[in-house]
UniProtKB/Swiss-Prot annotation:
GO CC annotation: endoplasmic reticulum membrane; ERMES complex
Spans annotated as Disordered: 65-141, 170-207
Similarity annotation: Belongs to the MDM12 family.
Gene it is expressed from: MDM12
Protein name: Mitochondrial distribution and morphology protein 12
Amino acid sequence: MSFDINWSQLVEDESINNSIKEFLASQFSSVSLPSYIDNLTVSDFSLGDKAPEIIIRDIGDTFEDFYEDEDGPRNAGAPTTTATSGMGESDSSDDEDTRDGLTGEVTLSETTESKTQFAPQPLHPIPTKLRRSHTTSAATPLSSHAHLNSLYAYNLTNVGLGTLNLNSATPSGRDTPTQILNQMRTGPNSPPISNTPISSSKKSKRGENDVQIIAEVKYKGNLHIEVTVDLFLNYPSQHFVTLPIKLHITGFEIHSLICIAYLQNAVYFSFLCDVSDDSQADYFNGAHMESGGNFVEYVSGTNNKERIDIIKKVKIESEIGEVETNVLRNVGKVEKFLVEKIRSIIREETAWPSWLCFDMSD
């Protein structure tokens, strides 16, 4: 099997950048803003030209949860034929052979190949529709709580490079993300896995080309988000001065385990857990916060009590011109506010049991 990922061709497609930009804009539009800012908009987005480092940890059947999402109105009467997204496909027998024989790591960067090759499908058309699919807000409190409890039970926040065992049994669609990761853990004292048989209705929905990849992704690139916002000076009176500022958010660092599922006419994406690095930093490094600084770094670390951070590090550069010191301090507040909201949005919308769906039916 061969995977050929042309990152430069992917990021040059404006439909991808625009879809993500619209997604972020819709999320920010629903955020409750503090009294000192208004008119928060996402003015630009770019994936950047630096590709992430990807190591495939497992290839298997897709999670049942994705088929529950396929039951929605979007897929009523939808055909089971697959669309192209830059990843070639082999026949079903080749897929099974590859899954059974996967015992090592496959590293992907900008272009990756393995020994057995097949003709890749053309990169275009690329999906132009980014759908918000299953999220924790759509699930019942009990079901969301159950998902999180299972992840806590296996301490997935601290999964590291040495904790994955590719010689374990090949996972199937009956497995949850927690069970997948548990099967790849080393150590004789790992708790047993209790699987529930797949229902006949779920089996009937599976297409012969449906496939799921569990991969470790490490990203330290130049993804760029441009945000414009009006900053208010509320002294000596409310909204005494309105100052438009532009913020460039970049320097994202991510090291996580992800799930990518390809089924029928859609690609599903979800972060499963963070992968621990050798060194960790403080939750926030706000050394430049008081001065505004025009350049601030924010680092998340082990002090964060959330299950998953996803974004380990991010930088913000502000364009405000020559202004007074008290204005710079307010800009520092805006920067910190944006970082917290971006991390929250990414975590809530893309971390399991939430996911993003790239609708390829159009």
